[in-house]
């Protein structure tokens, strides 16, 4: 799969989702960071709530992730459960924020009205 990045090809992986935190899960043996999503870390006030919300969304189901890049030791992508955009859903439910630096603002309009008052955002996403 990593070869497709070097060749500029589209990559997609599918498998059972095992949630790590509110914006990272393991799929088909790869750690996948949800592109454009900023959820609090487990050490932050809403981190466990975000993780539990993502677990409720994916329910250990088979998901498909369209990989768009790499970040540290993870791949980055948009993941789907059927036709549902999981990245959008965790934001829509109010457990994560749009990270405009990486999403281009794609998810900002679906954030709940109070999300930016309740959740911490990483400086690089502002």
Model-derived regions, located:
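Small beta-barrel nucleic-acid-binding modules, primarily SNase/OB-fold domains
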Residues: 2-126
């Amino acid at each position: 799969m990593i070869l497709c990045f070097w060749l500029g090809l589209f990559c997609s992986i599918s498998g059972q989702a095992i949630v790590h935190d509110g914006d990272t899960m393991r799929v088909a043996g790869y750690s996948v960071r949800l592109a454009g999503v900023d959820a609090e870390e487990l050490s932050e006030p809403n981190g466990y709530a975000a993780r539990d919300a993502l677990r409720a969304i994916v329910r250990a189901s088979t998901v498909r992730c369209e990989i768009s890049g790499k970040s540290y030791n993870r791949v980055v992508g948009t993941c789907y459960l059927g036709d549902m955009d999981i990245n959008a859903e965790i934001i829509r439910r109010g457990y994560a924020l749009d990270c405009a630096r990486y999403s281009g603002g794609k998810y900002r309009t679906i954030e709940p009205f109070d999300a930016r008052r309740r959740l911490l955002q990483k400086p690089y996403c502002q």
